[in-house]
Amino acid sequence: MSAKIIDGKAIALSVRQRVAARVAERKAKGLRAPGLAVVLVGEDAASQVYVGSKRRACEEVGFISKSYDLAPTITQDELLALIDQLNADPTIDGVLVQLPLPAHLDSTQVIERILPNKDVDGFHPYNVGRLAQRIPALRPCTPKGMMTLLENTGVKIKGMHAVVVGASNIVGRPMTLELLLAGCTTTTCHRFTKGLEQFVRQADILVVAVGKAEFIPGEWIKPGAIVLDVGINRLSNGKLVGDVEYPTAAQHASFITPVPGGVGPMTVATLIENTLQACEQYHS
């Protein structure tokens, strides 16, 4: 068996095109374009790359984009004051603070300061709680993007056994909630899980988000499984690889995301989708 590639770039492009078409419709009716404020603290190289891609995506779909590049020495109170200002701005539908923040800043307090109806990252406890209660509002971007990838396979996943390896607040935990909502029997594995291999081998759907290069051996993949690899790791030779050993996994799986070009593009596309949703549902 050789897996079909889940083309995240192509699917993300279709999402952005749908959003752009809707923005054009709004403008034609005399309605304002959605607005996204992107806040970057410090000069972390990876964060600058991510923020750049988010700003470009905004321009591409016709959003109003406001950028705030802040010194790494900014105080907690100064950052919270900026968030309050953006919360009160009627032209801004989404507020995004790029994580991680410098060590002296409390990211939990920052996330909780953003109004839930402007929390387009989907990190606020209110939005995660809505997902847990099966009444989702603004959903965390990477998990929501992966659900879009699953939908595009055409496979009916209700009743399947889904295994999520990794339990971060950003990916693993909310992805578990998304899969439960979709009717999967869901197992979450983490650093304290004993016998990881036995769980992975049972997975009809495998999601891996641990940030360790080729952490899951390809031979563990159940024949016919769907594999969603969230990891993006750079080897010493410069090659980018995921958290799953791709060449062997692709011989076992029915569908698999490549790295790069799989899950990553969907995160930004879903952020754009969430910002349009926030504009139309909460602020129009």
Curated annotation (Swiss-Prot):
Domain of life per record: Bacteria
Function as written in the Swiss-Prot or TrEMBL entry: Catalyzes the oxidation of 5,10-methylenetetrahydrofolate to 5,10-methenyltetrahydrofolate and then the hydrolysis of 5,10-methenyltetrahydrofolate to 10-formyltetrahydrofolate.
Gene, per the UniProt record: folD
Record GO biological process: L-histidine biosynthetic process; methionine biosynthetic process; purine nucleotide biosynthetic process; tetrahydrofolate interconversion
This protein's name: Bifunctional protein FolD
Annotated keywords: Amino-acid biosynthesis, Histidine biosynthesis, Hydrolase, Methionine biosynthesis, Multifunctional enzyme, NADP, One-carbon metabolism, Oxidoreductase, Purine biosynthesis
Pathway: One-carbon metabolism; tetrahydrofolate interconversion
Summary of subunit composition and partner proteins: Homodimer.
Similarity comment text for this entry: Belongs to the tetrahydrofolate dehydrogenase/cyclohydrolase family.
